[in-house]
């Protein structure tokens, strides 16, 4: 993604700022370091989606951490341990993520402080979150769409699909929430 005159990309657990004219690295901002006893255990990658507000880009390092970088300077603003395998989403104030155990977590965008965490969806295979209005929207492996409050993670609503499991992160298209299931069905939900 472009931030000012810099192309920002993920590379082995780091966000990297590149000069788009010649590909020279301007800065590197580590979100995670390799660890483990073999090459597979030491593999560290960033996963999509990422969350950008202004020049701040927040990303998840697979099963290791979530963090934010000021892409105008290449400076790491914060990094917090997090055990998720899907990307994150956020708004001006908060970054949201799902953990591998089914917990949903909200971090303050400015400093990474944990604002809330809920285990109401524990032991479900969750998608990455989508911030939509006052809700955080998350799909699961039973084909349910969960709408949680952005403020405290309290349940707001639950929508049912065909029961085959949500195949990808829900997306917003104009005024419609779009969900794709494992059976290939596409659902569109609009507020009344």
Q: Regions from the language model: what does each represent?
A:
Residues 20-23, 70-73, 108-111, 149-153, ...:
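Short loop/turn segments that connect beta-strands within beta-propeller blades
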């Amino acid at each position: 993604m472009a931030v000012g005159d810099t192309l920002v990309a993920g590379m082995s657990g780091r966000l990297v700022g590149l000069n788009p004219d010649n590909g020279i690295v301007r800065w590197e901002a580590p979100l995670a370091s390799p660890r483990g006893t073999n090459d597979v255990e030491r593999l560290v990658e960033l996963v999509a989606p990422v969350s950008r507000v202004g020049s701040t880009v927040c990303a998840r390092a697979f099963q290791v951490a979530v963090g934010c970088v000021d892409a105008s300077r290449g400076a790491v603003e914060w990094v917090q341990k997090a055990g998720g395998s899907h990307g994150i989403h956020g708004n001006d104030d908060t970054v949201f993520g799902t953990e591998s155990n089914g917990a949903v977590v909200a971090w303050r965008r400015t400093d990474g402080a944990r604002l809330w965490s809920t285990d109401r969806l524990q032991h479900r295979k969750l998608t990455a979150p989508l911030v939509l209005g006052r809700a955080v929207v998350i799909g699961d492996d039973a084909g349910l769409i969960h709408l949680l409050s952005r403020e405290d993670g309290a349940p707001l609503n639950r929508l049912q699909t065909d029961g085959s499991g949500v195949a990808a992160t829900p997306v917003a298209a104009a005024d419609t929430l779009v969900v794709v299931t494992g059976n290939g069905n596409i659902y569109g939900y609009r507020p009344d």
